Amino acid sequence: MRECISIHVGQAGVQMGNACWELYCLEHGIQPDGQMPSDKTIGGGDDSFNTFFSETGAGKHVPRAVFVDLEPTVVDEVRTGTYRQLFHPEQLITGKEDAANNYARGHYTVGKELIDIVLDRIRKLADQCTGLQGFLIFHSFGGGTGSGFSSLLMERLSVDYGKKSKLEFAVYPAPQISTAVVEPYNSILTTHTTLEHSDCAFMVDNEAIYDICRRNLDIERPTYTNLNRLIGQIVSSITASLRFDGALNVDLTEFQTNLVPYPRIHFPLATYAPVISAEKAYHEQLTVSEITNACFEPANQMVKCDPRHGKYMACCLLYRGDVVPKDVNAAIATIKTKRTIQFVDWCPTGFKVGINYQPPTVVPGGDLAKVQRAVCMLSNTTAIAEAWARLDHKFDLMYAKRAFVHWYVGEGMEEGEFSEAREDLAALEKDYEEVGVDSADAEGEEEEGDEY
C-alpha cells in the first residue's frame, strides 16, 4: 500500500482538514461514525481508499491524520462536531496557550512543548502503514502555529523520515485581506525554514478564493466554510488518484517528478474548474474543452498572479468523472494552438494528464453544483514569483523600521534570522527569474559567431 499521513496544523490547517475529511467520507461512502456499508473486506483489505483510512477489526475506518493546534478552541470544534466519532481522541492534539500569531512562539517556545507528543502520534500512524508514501501538511503561512510549528515539524520529519516525500497545502496571506499585521514576517520565516524540507507546496490565497466564491458561486459574503469547501475540492482532486482506481493514475512522487524541475522551484499553481452554482449548472453543458479552457483563466486560480506574464515549466491536468482521453487531447491541442501559453524553451510543451472515473462529489447543501466532470490543473509557472515579490515588499516595509521584531526576539529568536530568511527569499525570486530566461539568451553571451 502507498499510505499518506495528513497533518493539519493550526486553525487554517484544522479547518481545511475538516472540509477535506468531510469530502473524503462522502466520496467513499464512509459514515460520520467511521462505518462503511459498501466495504466488504472488514479489517484491512487492499482497497484504494486504505491509503487515507486505516481499518479496525470492528470495521471502523479511521483517517490517517493528526490535527495539531497550540490552543484548543478550533480542535474542540472537531471534538464536538459531526465527525467526532471518526477520529481517535489522540489524533486531536492541542496545547493550552496560543502561538499568538508569532512564528517564534510556534517554532521555539510554545511549539517545542508539543512537538514530541505530535511526533509520537505520527510514529504510531506510520507504524500502521505497510508502505508509507509521505506526508501531506496543511497549514497557513500567516499564523503563529501555522508558520512556526509547521516548520519545526517539517524539520523533525526530515530527520525521522528522511526519504519520505512531504507535500504542503499552505494558505498564503492574501494581498488585500489580512488577519494579522505580522503575516509577512511569519510567511518569510516559515518559507525559509521549510524550503529545503518540502518537496512540493500547493499555495492557496484566501483572496483569490473569496473572489471565486463571489464571482462564480454568487456568495456575497463568503465564510471560511465556503472557502474551505472549495479548497477541499482541489485537495480531493489532487489526492483522488491515490484513493481511487483509475485509468491514468498518478501517485505522490509522480507529481514531484513532473512538476518540480529544480528542488527549490516547487510551488505549483492550482486551478480548478468548473466552480459553478447549482442554478447555473442546470443550464450549461460543461464540455471537456470548456473546463480545460477555464483552467487557463487567471480568474480561476488559487493564487493571485498572472501566468500570462510568466512562463510555464510544467503542467499537469487531473480530470475526474466522465472524461475520455480523446477529448482531453483535442482540448489540449486547441489550447496549444490558440492560447498564448508560453513554455520555457528548455521544456518542450508537455502536459501530464491524469484521469479518474470517479465523478466529483459535492457536500449536500453546499454551494457547488453536482457536475459530471471536473479538472484540476497544477502548473509550475514563473508567474508565482509575483506572489513572493509582493510578500517580500511588505516584509521590507516593516523590517526597515524593525517594527514588531521585539516580539520575536523576546521569544528567543535572533534578529539575524530575519535577514537570513529575507536573503533566502531574494534568492528564490532570483531563481524564478533565471529559470524563465531563455537558454539561448544565456548562452548567446558567451559564444558569439556560432551560427549555423
UniProtKB/Swiss-Prot annotation:
Mg(2+) binds at residue 71. The lineage of its organism: Eukaryota, Metazoa, Echinodermata, Eleutherozoa, Echinozoa. Tubulin is the major constituent of microtubules, a cylinder consisting of laterally associated linear protofilaments composed of alpha- and beta-tubulin heterodimers. Microtubules grow by the addition of GTP-tubulin dimers to the microtubule end, where a stabilizing cap forms. Below the cap, tubulin dimers are in GDP-bound state, owing to GTPase activity of alpha-tubulin. CDD domains: alpha_tubulin. Its EC number is 3.6.5.-. Its main location: cytoplasm. It is an enzyme of class 3 (hydrolase). The record marks 452 as: Involved in polymerization. Pfam families: Tubulin, Tubulin_C. Undergoes a tyrosination/detyrosination cycle, the cyclic removal and re-addition of a C-terminal tyrosine residue by the enzymes tubulin tyrosine carboxypeptidase (TTCP) and tubulin tyrosine ligase (TTL), respectively. Acetylation of alpha chains at Lys-40 stabilizes microtubules and affects affinity and processivity of microtubule motors. This modification has a role in multiple cellular functions, ranging from cell motility, cell cycle progression or cell differentiation to intracellular trafficking and signaling. Keywords: Acetylation, Cytoplasm, Cytoskeleton, GTP-binding, Hydrolase, Magnesium, Metal-binding, Microtubule, Nucleotide-binding. Its cofactor is Mg(2+). Residues 433-452 are annotated as: Disordered. GO terms for biological process: microtubule-based process. This is Tubulin alpha-1 chain. The keyword Amino-acid biosynthesis does not apply. GTP binds at residues 11, 71, 140, 144-145, 179, 206, 228. The modification N6-acetyllysine is found at residue 40. GO terms for molecular function: GTP binding; hydrolase activity; metal ion binding; structural constituent of cytoskeleton. Dimer of alpha and beta chains. A typical microtubule is a hollow water-filled tube with an outer diameter of 25 nm and an inner diameter of 15 nM. Alpha-beta heterodimers associate head-to-tail to form protofilaments running lengthwise along the microtubule wall with the beta-tubulin subunit facing the microtubule plus end conferring a structural polarity. Microtubules usually have 13 protofilaments but different protofilament numbers can be found in some organisms and specialized cells. PROSITE patterns: TUBULIN (PS00227). It is found in: Cytoplasm, Cytoskeleton. It catalyses: GTP + H2O = GDP + phosphate + H(+).
